[in-house]
């Protein structure tokens, strides 16, 4: 009868009606509380609370008090719930569990655990609340300690802990726990463990779980079949993935997404796109899989085109934006990246940690570190991922002290945090700091991976310390990373910078070369040792091997042409970069070409290239032209170059001296004197040269 009243007035009348009754009517009060809860009426909760207190039902009827306690707990009003709990003379499992769960859901994990410890007796639900709560919050050591303390472990709590491990990136630990306990697993357990197999690409383990499902007669629902599709697809067994997909009467988007990603990860992009196109009314998950598949296969332009198509059908999410921003990074499309920043603000995704971190990375790698710093100052919440990204940003613009300060702010420093520091120091030429931090990692017994090893070897290469670099590589051999592509590429760089190009080439010839990184290292090695023709020959072999060059590849091969004066080869490569490979040359490519042309005496062509360049010209390019003019006796163009340098960099003493010399050699002593006078008036001084000799 009570639940038929809809208006607040009638509802209150119903409580007044009950108030007038003199009989014990606990079931009506329970229904009254349920009705209050369903309508989310806080005023009536309080009125009902007062009524129950007045009538003495809170002390005499536990079930009534528990329902009121649950209402306050679920609405996050834990202060009121605590007062009510303290007033209850009798409490049962439900009372304690409600408080434990309420505090856990409100983020007060410590208080929740204190209530759990005070609880006279605990049931399975009590254990599950604290274990799952700490697991979801990422405090896995606490969750595992509680799980180990359970007198009787149950499959529900096990599932919560397994899910927590996978959710927080510890899939390997989830598998280890599953194997250790040897539980009688239910469908949820097996589905969860299959997720771990997919994350780790553990095909053998996935097949074992599949066999266990078949032998045990476990009913395969759509979720379990989807998980099996995901395992086989991620592990590259596309035949089995397709077979499992056929077993699903109505495949969900997660299953299709897994297979689309599987085809893409194996380089079968056309089949991936065919599967994608067969589906109508595609959800964001499918779009994300296809966009990510294009990016994984270095088809970043296709990814951007597909993103534009997506916007006509559905709205992007944080994963979409992160993928598209990564495509912008690969293509060097700063303006498109800025548009993605606007999208993130427009759709409320800017506070997503992954999106913010990717934007920071984009601004840093696309030459706008100040924009990254501005974004970082506007971000309201941080996590380790975002702080690690900011460390890289600060290192990219040489703000080493700021990078150190951010590193100190990270409470739980991960291997990625330490690697960000060693890599940043190495890139900024801080060899001593690189070695110090690597030594600290060793003292803390942190694992050594390819990133830390390659950073330290690169630091050794920067000071041409072959002996120290080989000692670090010996460490790589001990931990089984001597064949790693990144580590081997660093070793090539070490040998070449120490002048042992043949040693570097031997490493290159014997290693696996799946991407452009080792090719870039070897081409750069030839360039720094003045072997331009060898660098160009290796660049051609790279194309024959099916490895697509990047902008960095073109930078190192153009540098080789510059060092060796290979003008015609440089022209062809610069043109091929634009026409054949679709790259837009950046400032560094233009600068290298200008220096190449000016050195070889093609000063007028170099000036034309500078004036046609779609970037703001800095003094360094005009300095290259000025050196070319002085070397080849082009006084008129040298005068123009020197004047441009003085205009852009008024404190550049070299430009004044060279301009004065140009006037003097042409007999215009008056103009030469005026330049010297202007130099003095602007307080520009030239530091005297000096040399050191061993005695």
UniProtKB/Swiss-Prot annotation:
Record-level Gene Ontology MF annotations: RNA binding
InterPro entries: E_motif, Pentatricopeptide_rpt, PPR_At4g14850-like_plant, TPR-like_helical_dom_sf
Compartments reported by the entry: Mitochondrion
Ranges where the record places region Type E motif: 621-695
Example of a GO cellular component annotation carried by this entry: mitochondrion
Keyword terms of this UniProt record: Mitochondrion, Repeat, Transit peptide
UniProt keyword Repeat present: yes
Spans of repeat PPR: 61-91, 92-122, 123-157, 159-184, 186-220, 221-251, 252-282, 283-313, 317-351, 352-382, 383-417, 418-448, 449-483, 484-514, 515-549, 550-585, 586-616
Domain of life of the organism encoding this protein: Eukaryota
Stored NCBIfam families: PPR
Family, per entry: Belongs to the PPR family. PCMP-E subfamily.
Name used for this protein in its record: Putative pentatricopeptide repeat-containing protein At1g77010, mitochondrial
Organism: Arabidopsis thaliana
């Amino acid at each position: 009868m009570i639940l038929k009243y809809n208006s607040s007035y009638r509802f209150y009348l119903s409580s007044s009606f009950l108030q007038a009754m003199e009989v014990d009517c606990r079931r009506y009060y329970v229904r009254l509380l349920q009705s209050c809860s369903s309508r989310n009426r806080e005023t009536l909760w309080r009125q009902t609370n007062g009524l129950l207190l007045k009538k003495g039902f809170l002390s005499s009827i536990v079930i009534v008090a528990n329902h009121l306690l649950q209402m306050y707990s679920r609405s996050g009003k834990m202060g009121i719930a605590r007062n009510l709990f303290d007033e209850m003379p009798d409490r049962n499992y439900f009372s304690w569990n409600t408080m434990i769960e309420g505090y856990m859901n409100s983020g007060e994990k410590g208080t929740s655990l204190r209530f759990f410890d005070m609880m006279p007796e605990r049931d399975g639900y009590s254990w599950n609340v604290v274990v799952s709560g700490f697991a979801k919050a990422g405090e896995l050591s606490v969750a595992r300690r509680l799980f180990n303390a359970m007198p009787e472990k149950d499959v529900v709590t096990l599932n919560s802990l397994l899910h927590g491990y996978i959710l927080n990136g510890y899939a390997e630990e989830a598998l280890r726990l599953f194997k250790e306990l040897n539980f009688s697993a239910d469908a949820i357990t097996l589905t969860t463990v299959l997720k771990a197999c997919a994350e780790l690409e553990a095909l053998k383990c996935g097949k074992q779980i599949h066999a266990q499902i078949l032998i045990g007669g476990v009913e395969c629902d759509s979720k379990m079949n989807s998980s099996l599709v995901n395992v086989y697809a991620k592990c590259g067994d596309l035949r089995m993935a397709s077979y499992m997909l056929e077993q699903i009467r109505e495949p969900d988007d997660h299953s299709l997404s897994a297979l689309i990603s599987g085809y893409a990860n194996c380089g079968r992009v056309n089949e991936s796109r065919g599967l994608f196109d067969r589906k109508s009314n595609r959800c964001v998950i499918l779009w994300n899989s296809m966009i990510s598949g294009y990016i994984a296969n270095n088809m970043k332009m296709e990814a951007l085109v597909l993103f534009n198509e997506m916007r006509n059908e559905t709205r992007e999410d944080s994963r979409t934006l992160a993928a598209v921003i990564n495509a912008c990074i690969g293509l060097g499309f700063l303006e498109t990246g800025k548009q993605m920043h606007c999208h993130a603000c427009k759709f409320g995704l800017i506070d997503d940690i992954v999106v913010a971190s990717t934007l920071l990375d984009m601004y840093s790698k696309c030459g706008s570190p100040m924009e990254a710093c501005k974004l970082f100052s506007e971000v309201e919440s941080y996590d380790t991922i975002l702080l690690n990204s900011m460390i890289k940003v600060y290192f990219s613009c040489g703000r080493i002290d700021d990078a150190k300060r951010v590193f100190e702010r990270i409470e739980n420093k991960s291997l990625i945090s330490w690697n960000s520091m060693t890599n940043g120091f190495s890139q900024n030429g801080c060899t001593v700091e690189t070695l110090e931090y690597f030594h600290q990692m060793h003292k803390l017994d942190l694992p050594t991976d390819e990133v830390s090893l390659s950073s330290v070897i690169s630091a050794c290469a920067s000071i041409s310390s072959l002996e120290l670099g080989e000692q670090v590589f010996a460490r790589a051999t001990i931990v089984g990373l001597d064949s790693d592509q990144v580590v081997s590429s660093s070793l090539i760089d070490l040998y070449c910078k120490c002048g042992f190009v043949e040693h570097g080439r031997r490493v290159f010839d014997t290693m696996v070369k799946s991407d452009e990184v080792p090719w870039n290292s070897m081409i750069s090695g030839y360039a720094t040792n003045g072997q331009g023709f060898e660098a160009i020959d290796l660049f051609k072999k790279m194309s024959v091997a099916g490895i697509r060059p990047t902008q960095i590849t073109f930078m190192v091969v153009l540098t080789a042409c510059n060092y060796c004066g290979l003008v015609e080869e440089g022209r062809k490569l610069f043109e091929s970069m634009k026409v054949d490979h679709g790259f837009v040359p950046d400032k560094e490519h233009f600068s290298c070409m200008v220096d190449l042309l000016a050195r070889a005496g093609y000063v007028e062509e170099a000036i034309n290239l500078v004036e046609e360049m779609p970037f703001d010209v800095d003094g360094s390019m005009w300095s290259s032209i000025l050196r070319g003019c002085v070397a080849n006796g082009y006084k008129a163009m040298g005068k123009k170059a020197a004047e441009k340098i003085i205009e852009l960099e008024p404190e550049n003493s070299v430009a004044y001296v060279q301009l004065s010399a140009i006037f003097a050699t042409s007999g215009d002593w008056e103009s030469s004197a005026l330049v010297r006078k202007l130099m003095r008036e602007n307080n520009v001084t030239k530091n005297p040269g000096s040399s050191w000799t061993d005695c």
